[in-house]
From Swiss-Prot:
Native species: Neisseria gonorrhoeae (strain ATCC 700825 / FA 1090)
Tagged with keyword Transferase: yes
Keywords: ATP-binding, Cytoplasm, Glycolysis, Kinase, Nucleotide-binding, Transferase
Origin: domain of life: Bacteria
Single GO term (MF): glucokinase activity
Reactions mediated catalytically: D-glucose + ATP = D-glucose 6-phosphate + ADP + H(+)
Protein name: Glucokinase
Amino acid sequence: MSSTPNKHADYPRLVADIGGTNARFALETAPCVIEKVAVLPCKEYDTVTDAVRAYLNQSGATGVRHAAFAIANPILGDWVQMTNHHWAFSIETTRQALGLDTLILLNDFTAQALAVTQTSSKDLMQVGGQKPVEFAPKAVIGPGTGLGVSGLVHSPAGWVALAGEGGHTSFPPFDDMEVLIWQYAKNKYRHVSAERFLSGAGLSLIYETLAVKQKAEPAKLMPSEITEKALNCESPLCRQALDIFCAMLGTVASNLALTLGARGGVYLCGGIIPRMLDYFKTSPFRSRFENKGRFEAYLAAIPVYVVLSEFPGIAGAAAALGNHLKNV
């Protein structure tokens, strides 16, 4: 008597998004089906292996053979030393300790880029532009704790995420005000990267610069407080800082779009923009994005999307694992 093969025989798969504070784990139980998401504080576990075992025990998962972890680190070989947590481990030794057939690691923003390929339209908010060109490159940029930058190019095997450190490219001031802000930062830091401004700490730096320029004592405000005061019209200085932040993001995003030829769209990830969607639609971002002289019409056609999905790192890890297993 013959039996029908189970096309999901290698499920469930373990996927994770590991940061310095929390590790988010989930099970992919079928293609693009993510279940049992759990957040574990990293400080409560001595090793990544301990955290994984705790999650598997908590979720009741059995028969897990394949796993992928997105992690806030460059992946340069077998040894991983987290820069913002004490966990350090060998990928191969961890695979063996967990009894897995497959364990792959990828940079967390590379995972976020891959997640774009699986994001549904309901989790995207378009800000200007027209329709994306099918199979054209896509640009992915994410201001948050830092500034993640990636791109997606299509190949016969599917979408490939470009792993780079574009957030650390030199920042290009656009006007006299941005030159003043750049000069203030240059006096504090040896290299003024795009990330110096396009991050939570960057918003605080812009605000600080404006306050000093006006010979005012800058209040000790968290980035979230600057944003809140700006959106509630409680502080003209905070509003100016947020306007400049969005304009700077427009410059950097359009530079990336031109570099990649990203007629497939520009995708904004990270934790900052989704907190101010109504404002962002009418912020200086889009006008600055298109302000490129002879290439204004080229950029005007490129759609920009704010990514709203809740766990893009986990979705991207699942996409990376699926791509890997197709090719082994």
